[in-house]
């Protein structure tokens, strides 16, 4: 009997979700198919790319270093969202609503948040690692030994867990029919939303920007032969690795900046600003 009551409650919540705004039920079939296609393509690329990265590092002894440890951690963070949340999002798209229960919704939202915040924290850790390797060569080995790297990796995921756990107590992980997924609600708590955007996006972006700017300055100085102190640290392979991670950072920042800026704007005045955000803009920033 309790299971039947729970099922009825879940179905009712789905029905209410469809009626909210211009929810999933009001969306043309071709739009749903396009979004589903984008999600499937993204999932396949995520799995293939990140699994190849992990296998390459594990199989090649030369790639097993402190810098690549954070790259593997980043790949793992990306895979979190593919293993559970994305299949449920695809299921919600094809069924015009969320059919699984509330627990599945919470788990999906938790893993999606862990993936996003874990990614930004790992990208930050990679930038700091590259900065220390290239600009602070004398202290690099002291910080990034085997034990130090393990401690820093653990710290990245502990901070990620600390960042996500408040969502469970605040009840801010809810189903959003605009994006067919259980995600962080930007209107649950204005103060918490501002804190999330500031601490988990703007601050890491500032740290990464500082690190890469310092590296760029040093690279330009070396190329212009202003200094030769760090030339051994700027081998072509290391420069390519730096450029690759810099591109990853730029793409991540560009992709996630719109959603975070929308959240910041909504948090300032949820009742007034929230309804002004067009569904298409929110969906585009999310996907």
From Swiss-Prot:
Q: Which residues are glycosylated?
A: 4, 10
Concerning InterPro entries, the annotation shows: GPCR_Rhodpsn, GPCR_Rhodpsn_7TM, Mel_1A/1B_rcpt, Melatonin_rcpt
SMART domains, per the entry: 7TM_GPCR_Srsx
Q: Which family does it belong to?
A: Belongs to the G-protein coupled receptor 1 family.
Gene Ontology molecular function terms on file = G protein-coupled receptor activity; melatonin receptor activity
Q: How does it sit in the membrane?
A: Multi-pass membrane protein
Keywords attached to this Swiss-Prot or TrEMBL record, sorted alphabetically, are: Biological rhythms, Cell membrane, Disulfide bond, G-protein coupled receptor, Glycoprotein, Membrane, Receptor, Transducer, Transmembrane, Transmembrane helix
Q: What induces it?
A: By cocaine, which increases the levels of day-time expression.
Q: Which residues lie on this side of the membrane: Cytoplasmic?
A: 50-69, 129-149, 214-245
- Protein's UniProt name: Melatonin receptor type 1B-A
Instruction: List the ranges whose topology is Extracellular.
Output: 1-28, 91-107, 171-192, 267-275
Regions crossing the membrane:
29-49, 70-90, 108-128, 150-170, 193-213, 246-266, 276-287
Q: Which Gene Ontology BP annotations are present?
A: G protein-coupled receptor signaling pathway; rhythmic process
Task: Name the source organism.
Answer: Danio rerio
Where in or outside the cell? Cell membrane
Any single GO CC term annotated in Swiss-Prot or TrEMBL for this entry: plasma membrane
- The cysteines covalently paired via disulfide bonds are 105-182
Pfam families per UniProt: 7tm_1
Described purpose of this protein according to its UniProt entry: High affinity receptor for melatonin. The activity of this receptor is mediated by pertussis toxin sensitive G proteins that inhibits adenylate cyclase activity.
């Amino acid at each position: 009997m309790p299971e039947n009551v729970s099922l009825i409650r879940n179905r009712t919540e789905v029905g209410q979700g469809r009626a909210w705004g211009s929810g999933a039920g009001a969306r043309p079939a071709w739009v749903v198919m396009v979004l589903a296609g984008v999600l499937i393509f993204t999932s396949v690329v995520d799995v293939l790319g990140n699994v190849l990265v992990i296998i390459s590092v594990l199989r090649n002894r030369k790639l097993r270093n402190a810098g690549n440890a954070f790259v593997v951690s980043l790949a793992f963070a990306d895979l979190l969202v593919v293993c559970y949340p994305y299949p449920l999002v695809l299921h919600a798209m094809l069924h015009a609503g969320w059919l699984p229960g509330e627990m599945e919704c919470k788990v999906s939202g938790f893993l999606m948040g862990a993936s996003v915040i874990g990614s930004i924290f790992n990208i930050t850790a990679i930038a700091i690692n590259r900065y220390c390797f290239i600009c602070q060569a004398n202290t690099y080995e002291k910080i990034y030994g085997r034990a130090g790297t393990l401690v820093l990796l653990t710290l990245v995921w502990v901070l990620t867990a600390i960042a996500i756990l408040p969502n469970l107590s605040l009840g801010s992980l809810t189903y959003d029919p605009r994006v067919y997924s259980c995600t962080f609600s930007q209107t649950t708590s204005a103060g918490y939303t501002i804190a999330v955007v500031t601490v988990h996006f703007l601050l890491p972006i500032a740290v990464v920007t500082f690190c890469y700017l310092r590296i760029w300055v040093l690279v330009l100085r070396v190329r212009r032969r202003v200094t030769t102190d760090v030339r051994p640290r700027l081998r072509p392979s290391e420069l390519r690795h730096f450029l690759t991670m810099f591109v990853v950072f730029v793409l991540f920042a560009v992709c996630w900046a719109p959603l975070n800026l929308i959240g910041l704007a909504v948090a300032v005045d949820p009742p007034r600003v929230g309804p002004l955000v067009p569904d298409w803009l929110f969906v585009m920033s999310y996907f």
